[in-house]
Amino acid sequence: ISLVTAEPAFKFGGNVEATYGNFNALILRADVTGPISDTVAYSLAGNLNRRDGFVRDLGINRDVNNRSRYGFRGQLLFQPSSDLKFRLIADFDSIDENCCAVVNLVAGPTVAAIRAVGGNVVTGAPLSYRVFNNFLSTNRIDNYGITLQADKDFGKFNLTSISSARGVDSRTNQDSDF
């Protein structure tokens, strides 16, 4: 599988999308592209994805399983001739959510063990979107990267060089005694 991001265009263009849904879900996406000169073009893109939590955590008395994400990408295309081009791409995205609530479907034999060590399990109402955690889970992730791509057309073959660096900062913590 190869996913290739669209190159910046030498003609101005753009797109905006907005979606609203239940639990105050809001998804926004936008991008713009255009020329800087005869040989340089740019593109900028951004997105936002937010939603209220829809699972009630009885242990900490709040809603969890929310969505809170955003990201940006910028590109510069330098095309000095029809057979040579360079693309510089930088991106960043961030997640800060209280995710991954797992509801109890069946009160099985492990319920007594969970309660014996101080935990609790919501029983008697499968698929009720209720959980019982001892602390608030955390899911904070920042991804970032930069890429330089060079493409040269030699007529009978093409040469592509891709150099890149990626980084991630991840802080996750979850009450996983379900």
Predicted regions and their residues:
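Outer-membrane beta-barrel domain signature, strongest for Gram-negative TonB-dependent receptors
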Residues: 61, 67-178
